[in-house]
Amino acid sequence: MFKPVDFSETSPVPPDIDLAPTQSPHHVAPSQDSSYDLLSRSSDDKIDAEKGPHDELSKHLPLFQKRPLSDTPISSNWNSPGITEENTPSDSPENSATNLKSLHRLHINDETQLKNAKIPTNDTTDYMPPSDGANEVTRIDLKDIKSPTRHHKRRPTTIDVPGLTKSKTSPDGLISKEDSGSKLVIVMVGLPATGKSFITNKLSRFLNYSLYYCKVFNVGNTRRKFAKEHGLKDQDSKFFEPKNADSTRLRDKWAMDTLDELLDYLLEGSGSVGIFDATNTSRERRKNVLARIRKRSPHLKVLFLESVCSDHALVQKNIRLKLFGPDYKGKDPESSLKDFKSRLANYLKAYEPIEDDENLQYIKMIDVGKKVIAYNIQGFLASQTVYYLLNFNLADRQIWITRSGESEDNVSGRIGGNSHLTPRGLRFAKSLPKFIARQREIFYQNLMQQKKNNENTDGNIYNDFFVWTSMRARTIGTAQYFNEDDYPIKQMKMLDELSAGDYDGMTYPEIKNNFPEEFEKRQKDKLRYRYPGIGGESYMDVINRLRPVITELERIEDNVLIITHRVVARALLGYFMNLSMGIIANLDVPLHCVYCLEPKPYGITWSLWEYDEASDSFSKVPQTDLNTTRVKEVGLVYNERRYSVIPTAPPSARSSFASDFLSRKRSNPTSASSSQSELSEQPKNSVSAQTGSNNTTLIGSNFNIKNENGDSRIPLSAPLMATNTSNNILDGGGTSISIHRPRVVPNQNNVNPLLANNNKAASNVPNVKKSAATPRQIFEIDKVDEKLSMLKNKSFLLHGKDYPNNADNNDNEDIRAKTMNRSQSHV
């Protein structure tokens, strides 16, 4: 950058290229204006020697330019205008903002006007004319100033955004354990059946997706656990009578015990946000909660979130859902309904809504987002919470997610790029509008049926249908056959694929061979790894730029089709399924398949539709043919285990064979057609169908394990296995449940063993009609399946042989050659 100078010799003449455009080379004859400087140079040698080497170096540097040549050229039309609506003076040195004192003298002539003048804050607020004693030195006793190092170590810091900020205490942008001032406690307030659990689950899901680790701490769970351990009888409505001193004392104890668990999670654990889920309907309770928090930490931010529901129909719907909750599970519905209404009346006696004179930071949601009141909001996380809560709705809608049709880069195996569709991709693009139009019609018919059945459907039930694409040519080409009058199309930069930076256009083998160290870094931590070069991104970068898309999806009441790319589709599916970041990077999003998501009050239901090139149609893949894994959801109620069924790539994902489902469909078109018809016409919102399996082996994950760096917030390795033998979709949340247990297969082709379940093993199990099977028979069948799977795993580990697969051996070779592998994908 700087040239070394030998001060013992005469400085060499620098070449012309090293000089600024405004300078002249030393060997060029000086102008008349500079002759005096040359004549007096010898007389100033002594002074120059005293100035030191820095001044000597400055003689050979280009002139400093406040606006370098890399800035916008002077001739640009985008310079600041000389005259604005406020009649700003021209930008000469005399009239610029650096000479504000002269501007005041031009407009204000006498002392009276000067005293009474109102100066605009955006122009001269920071300017103060010097006083008569401006030249006097004011001495300040430094002992009276508190040094920053003397503050408490848990002082709040500025904004932390995972993946976008970096500091000494937070190298990855996550809120550090020591920075308790940036953490948030959300205290729920409201009567039962007003939507508090719905709000907390959605809010927790959004915060965890944003990598602000959040958990819900439910006082009701503490009450039930205490009653079970101490043999207390069931708490009926009389237990919640405000005048019952004994029960009130117990309920206060349970509340404080739960709050202590929350504070331990924030102050001693890795949590950033803790949600205290309780009624907290009295001023006294809220005062005690705030005092307990301040006793543990004076720096934690506290936000009270009150849910008010004035919609009688919505309250009645929530009450019916409560009958399936843990307090009334397995009891007589009629007596349970009567008891819960009596409990609600007791809570209403002591209910005191939050008021401004309590001097709390609070949000009041009325009818689950129809009206939102925010008061005294402080802190970054609190403001993000308000922003998210403004985008709630309960409308029935569908969210369709698919990748672009097959592109030229998909065929060559190159990542990134902006290639166009292949002929096969164009066929998919032409068939997609017809499929979506049919599904839109079926969805509308189901809404009409709900209205006839008086299922609290709004008057205007006809949904618009939007199509969103990225700005890459392959997604735009996939949407080109949609009629924009019926399907408004919008291109979004946020939906672009993860940028590979310098590696854009390369294949994975090329990256591995040419940059083995970078390839290994990404294999170890795909979530945090950012591709080198300008524009290179990581999964965390994609997650951050998708936040506006997430909030818009939560806000709109219409259906939408998102045509995007693999990483973006993974991130969107991970949000709606409430998955850990370590799981998102392994979701299966094959080409020419469409995911359908339907938000529900208790979670999300999803299905997968696969394009059959031979018949030029789409078919819904039965759950028995899906490669799925059950994984534990994150950020929900503390000490509760909830699971989502997620799509995962099969061991044969890298093969060139067609999917088993399409192969069987071609071999037996009659049964496949009837199956498709039944799937298309079956009613939506069928709770009985979603809760059909209560004896299912679950494959979950323990998200509290620590990685090699001792950090338990983002696991770097695959999750652990966990099992559970009971599940209720209304109680447990999550996605729709398959009535068949996923089969676990050994690690093959470098596929994560937890995320590669082979359902083909089900073909070796006798087919039992579910309608004729009793719960006991289903339980026995699951036991046999589990033992069979264990024996096959053991056989593979001992002999190193793959499972026999007759279906693949019987496939037609012509079909293999013509059919694209639906899991062919990159990035």
Curated annotation (Swiss-Prot):
Binding site for ATP: G190, L191, P192, A193, T194, G195, K196, S197
Comp. bias regions, Low complexity: 31-41, 671-682
Enzyme class label: transferase
Origin: domain of life: Eukaryota
CDD domains, per database record: HP_PGM_like
SUPFAM superfamilies for the chain: P-loop containing nucleoside triphosphate hydrolases, Phosphoglycerate mutase-like
Alphabetical list of Gene3D superfamilies matching this protein: P-loop containing nucleotide triphosphate hydrolases (3.40.50.300), Phosphoglycerate mutase-like (3.40.50.1240)
Binding site for beta-D-fructose 6-phosphate: R343
Disordered: annotated segments: 1-97, 149-175, 649-704, 799-827
Catalytic reaction(s) noted: beta-D-fructose 6-phosphate + ATP = beta-D-fructose 2,6-bisphosphate + ADP + H(+)
Regulation affecting activity: Phosphorylation results in the activation of the kinase activity.
Transmembrane segment boundaries: none
Signal peptide: none
Composition-biased stretches (Polar residues): 72-97, 683-704
Residues recorded with modification Phosphothreonine: T157
SMART domains: PGAM
Cellular compartments per GO CC: cytoplasm; cytosol
Xref: Pfam families: 6PF2K, His_Phos_1
Active-site residues (renumbered): D277, C309, S404, E497, H565
Record-listed Phosphoserine modification sites: S92, S644, S652, S659, S667
Misc. remarks from the entry: Present with 1710 molecules/cell in log phase SD medium.
Functional note: Synthesis of fructose 2,6-bisphosphate.
Protein name: 6-phosphofructo-2-kinase 1
UniProt organism field: Saccharomyces cerevisiae (strain ATCC 204508 / S288c) (Baker's yeast)
